[in-house]
């Protein structure tokens, strides 16, 4: 009897181990199946090391890339190819965040049940992106050979409409790797971080709104310089006495340095974190770069950090989401690049992308920031430069040192669209990056 009991216990133990192992295997298959299926050694979907299946389209059905056994076929228009390089990818798979790398599992048509069976997946292995190829071309033209990036998304749906990074190359033309500029194979809006310059004053403003009493009555007298710990923070010109609206619209470095010092490093750190600027967003499995900040205990460094300098570095997409949250009363959709995928010939195989949302601000704070950003345009940048957009914006001039001209930033929103634009070494923000933003937004909103 005892032998039977021992055997029964042993059998049950082995059965339990088998079930646990089976559950673990199914879990691994579900989570990693697409990666395993799209491995380079799979001759069923690769030819001579090149992906031989799958296609990428823009939101309107424009073909951007089609993989065949004879090689990768790109759109016939060279401008579209250059403008969408960082979203679509190159033949050498150099851009890790591009569709032909990041969405490879979807392009091979992998399904948990059917695998990559060609009978069931057929020719419908396609990824429909959220981007508008024509909007990307407008951004590419507006940058006019200058290095930088343009990103626009619908803050209500999360769909990224425009995502351009320069320098770029034509993926359909073979290039000598030694002639490719540094940074060509990096999607800067997703994978890089930059000194934000005065765009960061929107973070300091949010912190001041929620932590400084009687901010509506606060004023600051700008004499063109502000001394902290025996060192000067300067403005390009004397602004005189300004309230918080005037301080932001004039981008007064002295006023904002004083606010940052008064608020303190702990508060500034809290708001950089809370507003999503140190977070990594998940864009359909693509992890964005995390911003980094150092709100030093030395007041002079804290003052510079409060105006977007010192060691401040922000990821462009994170800043764009913050703009969306200001537009959306404190909340915004998380960005996405996939509009839908078709993995199979079976009915109902067309799957739409869904985006979550983030809550970054109170509705009251967002409302005040909206009013102030609208005032920036009306009193400084000029509505006539952005006709019909009812633009809310903030410019930034980010000093990068090494004797180079500063980076020009322009970020904000118009209607349902939040944006961030940077022209590297472009000089003053509104003058260099503003026209780029206008051209792209005019196209998207027409």
Task: List where the protein language model places each region.
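Beta-lactam-recognizing serine transpeptidase/beta-lactamase-like catalytic domain environment
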Residues: 60, 156-192, 206-429, 445-446
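Periplasmic/cell-envelope proteins involved in peptidoglycan metabolism and beta-lactam response
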Residues: 1-177, 184, 193, 266-274, ...
């Amino acid at each position: 009897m005892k032998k039977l009991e021992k055997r029964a216990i042993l059998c049950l133990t082995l059965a339990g181990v088998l079930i646990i192992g089976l559950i673990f295997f199914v879990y691994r298959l579900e989570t990693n199946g697409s990666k395993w299926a799209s491995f380079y050694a799979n001759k069923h979907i690769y030819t001579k090391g090149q992906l031989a299946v799958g296609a990428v389209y823009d939101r309107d059905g424009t073909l951007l890339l089609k993989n065949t056994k004879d090689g990768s076929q790109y759109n016939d228009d060279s401008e579209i190819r250059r403008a969408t390089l960082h979203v679509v990818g190159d033949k050498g798979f150099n851009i890790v965040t591009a569709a032909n790398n990041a969405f490879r599992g979807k392009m091979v048509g992998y399904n948990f049940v059917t695998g990559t069976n060609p009978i069931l997946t057929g020719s419908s292995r396609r990824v429909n992106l959220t981007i508008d190829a024509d909007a990307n071309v407008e951004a590419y033209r507006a940058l006019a050979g200058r290095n930088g990036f343009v990103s626009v998304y619908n803050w209500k749906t999360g769909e990224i409409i425009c995502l351009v990074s320069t320098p770029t190359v034509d993926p359909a033309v073979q290039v000598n790797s030694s002639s490719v500029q540094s940074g060509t194979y990096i999607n800067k809006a997703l994978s890089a971080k930059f000194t934000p310059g005065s765009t960061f004053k929107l973070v300091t403003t949010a912190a001041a709104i929620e932590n400084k009493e009687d901010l509506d009555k606060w004023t600051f007298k700008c004499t063109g310089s502000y001394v902290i710990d025996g060192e000067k923070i300067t403005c390009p010109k004397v602004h005189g006495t300004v309230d918080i609206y005037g301080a932001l619209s004039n981008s007064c470095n002295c006023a904002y340095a004083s606010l940052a010092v008064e608020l303190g490093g702990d508060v500034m750190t809290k708001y950089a974190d809370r507003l999503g600027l140190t977070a990594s967003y998940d864009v359909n499995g693509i992890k964005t770069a995390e911003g980094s900040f150092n709100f030093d205990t030395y007041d002079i460094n804290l003052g510079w950090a409060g105006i977007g300098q010192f060691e401040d570095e922000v990821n462009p997409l994170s800043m764009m989401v913050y703009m969306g949250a200001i537009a959306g009363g404190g909340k915004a959709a998380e960005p996405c690049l996939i509009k839908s995928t078709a993995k199979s010939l079976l009915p109902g195989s067309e799957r739409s992308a869904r985006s979550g949302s983030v809550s970054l601000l109170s509705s009251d704070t967002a409302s005040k920031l909206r009013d102030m950003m609208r005032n920036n345009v009306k009193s400084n940048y000029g509505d006539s430069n952005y006709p019909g957009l009812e633009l809310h914006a903030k410019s930034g001039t980010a000093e990068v040192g090494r004797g180079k001209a500063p980076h020009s930033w322009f970020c904000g929103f118009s209607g349902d669209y939040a944006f961030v634009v940077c022209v590297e070494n472009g000089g003053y923000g509104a003058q260099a990056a503003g026209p780029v933003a206008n051209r792209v937004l005019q196209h998207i909103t027409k």
